[in-house]
Amino acid sequence: MILKTTGGSPHFNIALEEALLEESAEHGIAIARLWVNPDSIIVGYTSDVGREVNIEQARAEGVPVVRRISGGGAVFHDLGNMNVSVYIPRRLGVDEAYALVTSIILKTLHRLGIEGRVENGNDVAVGPWKVSGSAAAIRARATLAHATLLLTTDPSRIRRLVIPQLHRVERGEVTPVKYNPNSLERITGERMEVWQAARLLEESVKHALGEPENVGRDILQEAVIRARELCKTKYSQKGFWSPLGLGACREPQVAPMTSPSYVL
């Protein structure tokens, strides 16, 4: 099943990641999700928010911080960034999870005539710029691998809000690409809307996972109910994230990708 989700608060959208992972495990089905998030900083499960996020700037701009269930560092989401998530009903290795989701991004870039490459295992670069980062959450019965794709996001906002961990470059742990983000619009000089990216990503997901299974609406309803509870009890709680608040659990519209509208 390939889903699209429209709107919703960052807290609910991240809660839905955990809920869909649980649905994948329980029902033994592969699910993919294409989605956008309003302005937010999404940090890894073990991220040190104080070291990775410019909290004062985030407060000044009204940007909430939300912690996801996967590892990795802090990333900035806005409506110019497309997210793709895949939920696989088995335990994958970290490298296998990264290879799966980066292949979807690379295939999408190839369809656009853009040459991309993987760096640092979980980044996709075009020239000297990072256009996509990915992370994974691995459980006993299912794996979540998700990635960003910077379409029109202003990279100066990322640099204002997310603190690059340059000591990792100095130690030789990662290449400088990891902390050199840029959007496809600025690299190519051509604007791509999210609905256009959704169409291309949908084809890339099918190439990676095969034709999606036809799953009933009851699984979607179960996922939304799970996410509703997770958002209320976990993801909107200030102590779980940061002192930033803005924890309203505003729900997105959730629909199969087969519906006629691609407007996200």
From Swiss-Prot:
Pathway listed: Protein modification; protein lipoylation via exogenous pathway; protein N(6)-(lipoyl)lysine from lipoate: step 1/2; Protein modification; protein lipoylation via exogenous pathway; protein N(6)-(lipoyl)lysine from lipoate: step 2/2
Binding site for ATP: R68, G73, A74, V75, F76, K130
Span of domain BPL/LPL catalytic: 26-213
E.C. code: 6.3.1.20
InterPro entries reported for this sequence: aa-tRNA-synth_II/BPL/LPL, BPL_LPL_catalytic, LipoylTrfase_LipoateP_Ligase
Signal sequence segment: none
Cellular component terms per the entry's GO annotation: cytoplasm
Major subcellular site: cytoplasm
Binding positions for (R)-lipoate per the UniProt entry: K130
Coiled-coil features, chain-numbered ranges: none
Pfam families per UniProt: LplA-B_cat
Additional free-text comment from the UniProt record: In the transfer reaction, the free carboxyl group of lipoic acid is attached via an amide linkage to the epsilon-amino group of a specific lysine residue of lipoyl domains of lipoate-dependent enzymes.
Oligomer status and interactors: Monomer.
Family in the record: Belongs to the LplA family.
Annotated protein name in UniProt: Putative lipoate-protein ligase A
Gene that this polypeptide is encoded by: lplA
